[in-house]
Amino acid sequence: MNTNSNTYTVIYSIILVVIVAAVLAFSAMFLKPMQDANVKKDTIGQILTAATVEGEDILATYQQEIEKAILVNIKGEEVGTLNVEECEVYGNSDLKRQIAAEEKALPVYIFKNGITVVPCYGAGLWGPIWGYVGFEGDLKTIKAVRFGHKGETPGLGAKIADEPSFAEAFTGKTVGEGEILFEVAKPANRQTETNGVDAFSGATITSQALGKTLDQWFGFYQNYFAKNGITAEEVVDAVIDETGELEPVTEVEPANTVEE
């Protein structure tokens, strides 16, 4: 065949394109299991942060420290479980499907330290945003959070994931019981002090999107929270059951005074 002909050039180009496409397809198939494993590891790391659990080996730490991982419906009823030994967790695609699903199966991660972690997922300014919220035993008081995003503006909306002080602001805040369960807004626009945190200056849209996402997902879990949250009285009862008696409060004697 004449290597200078147009026919040769076309055939050569087609063969080259087919070879490159085959190599790319093979590489994608070969690398996908490793990519999926990395995504799962990152997801579990975020869950552990919300649960205030630390460990060098993320997967091993998760297996050791989690008590159980369940799925609940909108009524707060348990409808399934996640395999803890295999570190089975819901990824972002799984969470996205639950938003529009008529029969929801929402993940709940319950840890041995008493922290319960639930996820959230929604739309930010430039792409998806997500997060994990760790609750105290009352399932109202937030212990810790970890947020992530795909394309928010660096230095502005991206601060939901990058700014430690923003995450720290959630600690001690509670989920409300009214029409709005939680807000991320400027102080002047917030309805309550305890059921929300301040929005970032210059990142109003991302802040509002995160607030709406949290409010929506807390609504999904509202019945579960109401049915499973531990009250202060139940905490006292649990202490009595464990010790067999409630220790009396020891009176503190006043300090000696100096007589003139």
Q: Which residues does each predicted region cover?
A:
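Flexible, solvent-exposed loop/hinge segments and secondary-structure transition points
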Residues: 2-260
